[in-house]
Swiss-Prot record:
GO terms for cellular component: plasma membrane. The chain crosses the membrane at residues 8-28, 49-69, 75-95, 118-138. This is Type IV secretion system-coupling protein VirD4. PANTHER family: CONJUGATIVE TRANSFER: DNA TRANSPORT (PTHR37937:SF1). It is a multi-pass membrane protein. Gene3D superfamilies: P-loop containing nucleotide triphosphate hydrolases. It comes from the Bacteria. Disulfide bonds: none annotated. The gene is virD4. It is found in: Cell membrane.
Amino acid sequence: MKYTKIQLALILMPIALGALTIFLVPHLLSFMINDLKANHVYWYVRSEPLLVLMLVATVSLCYTLSQKLHLRKAITLVSAVFFGITALYFIGGEIKRLTPYVGQQGITWSYALKFMDPMVVFGVICGVVLLVIQVMISSPPTSKVKRAKKGIFGDASWMNLKEAAKIFPANGQIVVGERYRVDQDGVCNIPFAPGNKTTWGKGGTAPLLTFNLDFGSTHMIFFAGSGGYKTTSTVVPTCLTYPGPIVCLDPSTEIAPMVRFARKKMGNRNVIVLDPNSLLTKNFNVLDWLLDDSVPRTQREANIVGFSKLLLTDKKSENSSAEYFSTQAHNLLTALLAHVIFSDEYEDSERNLKTLRAILSQSETAVVNQLRMIQETTPSPFIREMVGIFTEMADQTFSGVYTTASKDTQWLSLSNYADLVCGNDFSSSDIANGKTDVFLNLPASILNSYPAIGRVIIGAFLNAMVTADGKYKKRVLFVLDEVDLLGYMNILEEARDRGRKYGTSLMLFYQSSGQLVNHFGEAGARSWFESCSFVSYAAIKDLQTAKDISERCGQMTVEVTGTNKSRGLSLGKSSYNVNYQQRALILPHEIIQEMRQDEQIILMQGQPPLRCGRAIYFRRKEMLAAANKNRFAPQAKKN
């Protein structure tokens, strides 16, 4: 741990205080013996070693008590060294005094040491006792509750770090955290400050906890509140270590600049950045996986139905008419998308979302006329049936459907975003080759307004892996930061349930469990918790999320002692009893108020909950050296 100059001065202060004590004690004794008799003076002078040793240890103890916990360990070490030197000085004087007598008349050292000055001996003993007390107050506080030996009401406990090392070895692929208990570290009582290295404790030096995608569904969910170091503690470290393909959603647009060159060095990888605000951005056709003629037509038609859902803003509404218009808008988009993909009137280069938007950009009358023409000329029964719904629809009803479909594809009128999903620089199937990474630099402000941009891109890559039908080189890791911005995506549930065999692993980041419930419902959220390999919680501020964590960590049995004192005539009588009570392993308020931001709780099936540190990249030298500078993260103070 590195300290500032002021903190170094505070740590070395026991040397100055001890030296001052050694200097003052003789003067104090001289002042006290001025008017004393000779026999009294003798004992005062004899007591000098005892006073010096005890006062040096006492002053150090009092000074240590006045300092913050994270400095006490270093102060205690300095105090122990200084006391040891002082004690050796007095012991050395006694040995020098006794040396001439050793060897005379058969006197041995074991016999001579019995005549050491008792003042020195007792001074050393008292000083050591005070040092032990100083060490105890310098250690992190132990648990406030006493666990019962019998688990009558439950026996929940935190996972042993040795067991954690077996499940999450240090040399794996996906960085999960650091193998140490933050709540048992010397800095546990002070807030984590990224710019102050003295608040880091063991963070940055402890062994890593990593996941090798070797158990469960290989999917992961991370919950961390706003400003909870989701990106710096998990996303960036994983991008620096994962050897397979990555598809990363980055609403903060900070990840790609930091890890791009590091990813390129990992086996000469092809790193693609989709950035609508950059002239150098790559682009691809999000419909290319639907244009594969080797896939049966019926399967392609079913895929079109699923993909068209991604174009709609799926917001839950209690208004039945709004739900109706949304459903019909989905049918309209499905019909027109199928027409664009299968119709002979379009060239292959025109089979994209721009063409779909061009149709919807027409007037309502023109769209209805085109739908009638499609119904009369298309050879596809699927398209004919889908279009037939709208050719006989009342004008006012169709107007509502048309407005909904047009509004949800409005973003395709923005040329930079339309070009992003309608190009040909690469194919969505390229991620299956094991050498391609894709970073989506889509600002959060745009995703808030037009979530469909991110949905269709991520949906295209997920569907491309399904279309590959198990023919992939390495598992593709979908790192979706702030996935709440995308809204409800049915395809994520499909990837969750069947993605393992298709080579896809999901790493989802939410700010609270409420966001997950908001999009998938209570039952859907439970399905996510049941299906993931593990769930991580950190920097939690939401009370409901804290309650959920507390319940999932389980209950333990604690001993509660009580003393009853009787009053009145039977004074002095008291009874002592021990009761067993149930207590949560960790209470909701402890999660919110006492857990530091660099601490997390990991829950997985069949294992105790794991409480450990977070691998914040700028605390680890090897990661800081590999990553480029983060323009958002505060820089550590330089000494």
